[in-house]
Amino acid sequence: MLIIPAIDLKDGACVRLRQGLMEDATVFSDDPVAMAAKWVDGGCRRLHLVDLNGAFEGKPVNGEVVTAIARRYPDLPIQIGGGIRSLETIEHYVRAGVSYVIIGTKAVKQPEFVGEACRAFPGKVIVGLDAKDGFVATDGWAEVSEVQVIDLARRFEADGVSAIVYTDISKDGMMQGCNVEATAALANATRIPVIASGGIHNLGDIQKLLDARTPGIIGAITGRAIYEGTLDVAEAQALCDNFKA
């Protein structure tokens, strides 16, 4: 399992939100490229970038920062989400050197777009499913749908999606522990690999994900915990590497 540091971009700065609320943002750095360097130096093997402005505006806003990070670390797998709602945007990021694009809102509202994207950019597409009480949320979490997460995930199996980033909104940015049960249930219900997101606070939370013994969980995204120092990237990755399932 990979430990994947998150860099959330708002107005060119690196921030963290609590429960997806744009008005509840903590700025951790005004130099996201330097922040990426910190996590790379700390031993991370993959980065998770989010264009928060893009998620709310429906188009890339912090694209220059994303490109700068991708060009600085051409051998590091980077995944980007936020405002990805067209094939043109995906092409822009792929050309910039990004390894994976995460389709969120559009995957829920127009599921057929995921198939189009997978055909145009095979192996490059991740679906981001954000949930509240098992139901999918969209538009920067502003709307909660009547669609069950597991039902939607199964729909994408035939498309060739590389992974699902699963976020429990009630946990995100609160550092109260990951929703292991829901994450494992999703991973067991679909053939698509799952990346856990939201609520990871410390090594104990990583251990709980490992203890779920769910091969389908291939990574864990962490944000506030690594910024506030309750989790060390290298230590967490070592725990994963040494875990015997």
From Swiss-Prot:
GO biological process: L-histidine biosynthetic process; L-tryptophan biosynthetic process
Coiled coil: none
EC number from the UniProt entry: 5.3.1.16
Gene3D superfamilies: Aldolase class I
Family matches, as SUPFAM superfamilies: Ribulose-phoshate binding barrel (SSF51366)
One GO cellular component, as annotated: cytoplasm
UniProt keyword Chaperone, yes or no: no
Keywords in alphabetical order: Amino-acid biosynthesis, Cytoplasm, Histidine biosynthesis, Isomerase
Active site location: 8 (proton acceptor), 130 (proton donor)
CDD domains assigned: HisA
InterPro entries with a match to the protein in the record: Aldolase_TIM, His_biosynth, HisA_bact_arch, Isoase_HisA-like, Isoase_HisA-like_bact, RibuloseP-bd_barrel
Catalytically driven reaction(s): 1-(5-phospho-beta-D-ribosyl)-5-[(5-phospho-beta-D-ribosylamino)methylideneamino]imidazole-4-carboxamide = 5-[(5-phospho-1-deoxy-D-ribulos-1-ylimino)methylamino]-1-(5-phospho-beta-D-ribosyl)imidazole-4-carboxamide
Keyword Cytoplasm: yes
Biological or metabolic pathway of the protein: Amino-acid biosynthesis; L-histidine biosynthesis; L-histidine from 5-phospho-alpha-D-ribose 1-diphosphate: step 4/9
Domain of life: Bacteria
Localization per record: Cytoplasm
One term of GO molecular function: 1-(5-phosphoribosyl)-5-[(5-phosphoribosylamino)methylideneamino]imidazole-4-carboxamide isomerase activity
Family, as annotated: Belongs to the HisA/HisF family.
NCBIfam families: 1-(5-phosphoribosyl)-5-[(5-phosphoribosylamino)methylideneamino]imidazole-4-carboxamide isomerase (TIGR00007)
The protein's name: 1-(5-phosphoribosyl)-5-[(5-phosphoribosylamino)methylideneamino] imidazole-4-carboxamide isomerase
Underlying gene: hisA
